Amino acid sequence: LLGWMHLNKKPLMLNDPRTDERFRGVQWDESIRSLLCVPMMVKSTLVGVLTVYNKREEVAFTDEDQRLLAIIAGQSAQIVENARLYEEEQALQRMKEEVRLAATIQMDLLPKTPPDVAGYDIAGVSIPAQLVGGDAYDFIPIDSTHLAVCLADVSGKGLPASLLMANVQATLRGQTLSSPTAAVCVQRANKLLHQSTSPDKFVTLFYSLLDSSKHTLTYCNAGHDNPFLFSGSGMPKRLGTGGLVLSIMEDFPYEEEVVALSPGDVVVVYSDGITEAVDPAQTQFGDRNIESVVAARRTLDAAGIIDGIVGAVREHAGSAPQADDMTIVVIKRK
């Protein structure tokens, strides 16, 4: 009966089932004299079957019986559908709550306050495109004059990217305190991530060590958008020394570079969600706009420079939705 109803989706009345040609060969239970079966339908979808057997006084089922049972089946189908929708809504609410908690945990992993480094003003911000994201930045104190400053971007967005980013943050924090140089730290982190990350995922990373006593920044760029170093009145320098994105090749020989920081110099590190932000005509914000904003705001503090960049991106995007996570870190020597 269920198979027939699934194929035909219409009422079935059998007042003598043993002689019905449609069910030749079926071994009916001896207690079944007659039956009336109607589908329970919701928007052309079969959600159940309502069947009654053996009308009293051994009389045959009628069209009126079928009409009445069809009404009952329709009401029952709606009850079943309402119960299903309620369960789906409850599951959706539970999932939303889990994502909200994940977002809270992720935000708690970001620095809560800017680092206090003598002679420097440092700030960062991360704005996910969804409730949770795959961008993150970190300030990791090493000693009184050394601070690790890093910004990472995991491929993808949403909850999967945020879970991988949590692993990246933990890995970098662990390796920072035990690695002698920036390149060694990135190389060790890459090896660990390669072992624990699926082949279709990767991470871009800008990792740097600020020495506030020597006023130098030693950095290693693992496939990340090249940050800007604004120094003097000339063209900004792009910080591109490093190597491949993380987790692609287990043993990659990363390189590092040391740059000197003079009073007033500004380092701007950003994720591709900044430069690839588009307006309604699909025109990207681009690198040049970052240069223009920073050039006009170099006298401001690090937070002011960040606000200027974010504001310019918002103005450029207009009504276009944010498609990717946006993260910026600014280091300014006073």
Where are these predicted regions, by residue range?
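Short beta-strand-to-loop transition segments that serve as allosteric relay/switch motifs
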Residues: 33, 49-59, 65, 154, ...
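Allosteric cytosolic regulatory segments
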Residues: 70-77
